[in-house]
Design a protein with these regions (language model features):
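Alpha-helix initiation/capping motif
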Residues: 1-2, 99
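Small/polar beta-strand repeat architecture
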Residues: 2-57
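Recognizes the extracellular SEMA beta-propeller fold with strongest preference
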Residues: 43-167
């Protein structure tokens, strides 16, 4: 990992609850300097997904359809985005799920809902493919008679929370 104290960058190879190991000072052409114990320590970061506009509240779901751990994010405005274990970002590319406010993985399908344009509709993907939406391959949609506000898997059921009802 990488740490920054004032203008000096440090790299490290390991970390436990109290210690960084394998620390190298003054990396990336920075200069080693004296630091006070009150100096702010920060971690540098890398943007993983740019171009998201007007995002509102984010909702996340962790899933594994193909032996690889992934996280999917919805933000009420943009296409859902999937991050794999290498932190590479891929947008789910169908307009039927763009702007979803809630997402849940259930029985090897991804369920998307809560869009402002279709607040009563839940769209689900093909099995084992969060970005596949062919009805002939097992994808589809359902409508409930209330505005969807949350999706939650509990044991073997998908609960659909709406403004006035729970399905």
């Amino acid at each position: 990992g990488t740490l920054q104290i004032n203008s000096e960058l440090f790299t490290y190879t390991g970390i436990n609850s109290t210690t960084f190991t394998g620390v190298t000072r003054a990396t990336s052409s920075t200069t080693a300097a004296a630091h006070a114990k009150t100096d702010v320590v920060s971690e540098s970061w890398t943007a993983r997904d740019t171009g998201r506009t007007s995002a509102a509240k984010y909702h996340f779901e962790r899933f594994n359809f193909d032996g690889n751990e992934k996280i999917i994010c919805v933000d009420q405005t943009n296409y859902p985005v999937v991050f794999n274990s290498a932190m590479a970002a891929t947008d789910v590319s169908t307009s039927s799920v763009q702007g979803s406010t809630v997402v849940a993985a259930y029985r090897n399908h991804m369920f998307y809902g809560g869009k402002s344009t279709t607040p009563q509709e839940i769209v689900f993907s093909e099995p084992f493919n969060e970005d596949g939406f062919s009805s002939g391959a097992g994808a589809g949609s359902i409508k409930v008679d209330d505005t969807v506000v949350a999706l939650k898997v509990f044991r073997d059921s998908l609960f659909i929370f709406c403004e006035n009802r729970i399905f």
